[in-house]
Amino acid sequence: MKKIVLMAMMIATGYSATAQDEIETTVAADFVSSYIWRGLDCGSVAVQPTLGIGYKGLSLSAWGSYGLTNSDDVKEFDLTLAYTTGGFNIGITDYWFSAGLDPDARYFKYDAHGTNHVFEANIGYDFGPLSLQWFTNFAGNDGLNKNGKRAYSSYMEVAVPFRLATVDWTATAGAVPFATTSYGTNGFAVTNLSLKATKEIKVTDTFSIPVFGQVVGNPCSQNAYLVFGFTLQP
């Protein structure tokens, strides 16, 4: 606690430029034509703000999604604590949704059988040419398996980034290994095949806007999506 307080004082007063340089802050917002997550349709046009801080591989970030055109879209607010060293990463995310077990959508209600929170742990490794990630829900409003018990819903993903024709691309394949109502699967199922392209549009000499398009297919649900979006970040 003393170290945290001292760090905050150093930032506020500017006593240590070196310490400030080591602390990374992220403030950004994505605007998307539809909210597609792991091959699932989670809503229509949305703004998705991000606020984060990182120090020597440890990061704490807040992320949200809020529908702009459909009042029925579920609001989301997530907190993620993560650590990265080299290519290895590990983290815990607290997802909160405005729809769930609590009809009053209370954020600070954490009852095991009455909360709108979902807690997920993840582990992964970035090999450079590709990255592997595994995610598992371990508490909160998780889905159910075929026996009607907590499914510990999991998702695994491989992503391959590459550059082609001055555009940054990412090809992704994701699957759900076990039956769960969270993803609507009865067993192992491929739920996410996507290809995303991102290009920065120069506005001024010091400001650019990343614009992206993404094709997403979900073989399990037999659905496909085309998403457009852009990012604002100072």
In which residue ranges do the predicted regions lie?
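Residues that define the transmembrane beta-barrel architecture of outer-membrane proteins
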Residues: 23-25, 43-47, 73-77, 115-121, ...
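Short loop/turn motifs that connect adjacent beta-strands in outer-membrane beta-barrel proteins
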Residues: 20-24, 91, 160-171, 198-211
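Detector for outer-membrane/organellar transmembrane beta-barrel domains
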Residues: 109-180, 233
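Outer-membrane beta-barrel "beta-signal"
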Residues: 160, 195-197, 201, 222-234
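Outer membrane beta-barrel transmembrane domains
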Residues: 168-203
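Cleavable N-terminal export/targeting peptides
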Residues: 1-24
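Transmembrane beta-strand segments that form the barrel wall of outer-membrane beta-barrel proteins
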Residues: 28-35, 58-68, 90-98, 105-107, ...
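Outer-membrane beta-barrel initiation region
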Residues: 20-53
